[in-house]
Amino acid sequence: MARTPIDITLPDMTGSRAVVTGASDGIGRHIATRLAAAGAEVVLPVRNPDKGRTALAAIEAAVPDAQVSLRTMDLSSLESVAALGATLRAEGVPVGILILNAGVMTPPERQTTVDGHELQFGTNHLGHVALVGQLHPLLVAGRARVVSQVSVAANQGAVHYEDLDWERSYDGMKAYSSSKIAFGLFGLELDRRSKAAGWGITSNLSHPGIAPTALLAARPEVGRSRDTLGRRLIRVMSARGILVGTVETAGLPALLAATDPAADGGRFFGPSGPRNLGGAPAEQPLYGRLADREQAARIWDLSLRLTGMTGLGTPAAGRDIEAAS
């Protein structure tokens, strides 16, 4: 079956700095490439320098005049996130777009971050919360558009408040869903807090549907070294245009959330095909689990406490964050 071409047109982004996490490969690299092609100056925080250099070369090959550079950051280490924040604040360039795309998915065995949190909760959620806190002065200065990349998994399960780090009984898929629900709730609360305080930050959510990405591929570093029938099936379906998306189309919802003037905060974008697994990007109703404002406020307070970003949103936020780093 021939796949119908799917794309969106990005506005001219010359003069705007964009920061994209998880851009070493897959969806994140495609997002970064499109932003660079639109004229943005793109910063790629990467954990693996070799993969980062490969991504940089690929983006520069696709966009010869790209303004793109690497920085070092490991989302599973709050100290590493703080170091990146200090570096970017020292550079003093306002951030106009922040796309929080990086993630880790379903390690078969429980693993922890440098700071002792369950790997998915600590990386997918807390690491990104800390990054928002560290970059807050630059986000305000750039009247930034922040996009939190969640998942169809945020439509199942719940935040595991009674055991956030899954120390008693680990279930990889449930832990993944919990991390993505928490992350989505925080992204929506960020928009509400910004509007209330006049920060000028616009925060939306997106999800990529399903596509053959590194998140689904063999990941020896999280204990997944074998390919599986399910992953092979997704690759075949993607290549034939059946139900799921491609790496390129899966990045479009985040790009739409980041650049569409109608995406004015608190909105949710994803693929519009059957079961929202593939297809053209479009706004979608919030998953019920993400629409609970009381839970969002709870996650906000809890997340800032766990990341040491409790000064976020106060008049002294910039000084508090500087001191924390």
Model-inferred region functions:
Residues 1-5, 278-289:
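Short, contiguous pre-domain boundary segments
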Residues 21-23, 76, 123-124, 245-246, ...:
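A short, hydrophobic secondary-structure junction motif
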Residues 44, 73, 242, 288-291:
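Pocket-edge positions in alpha/beta enzyme catalytic cores
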Residues 167, 223-238:
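A short C-terminal helix-loop "cap" of Rossmann-like NAD(P)-dependent dehydrogenase/epimerase domains
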Residues 179, 231-283, 293-297, 301, ...:
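C-terminal helical subdomain
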Residues 322-325:
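Short, intrinsically disordered terminal tails adjacent to the first/last structured region
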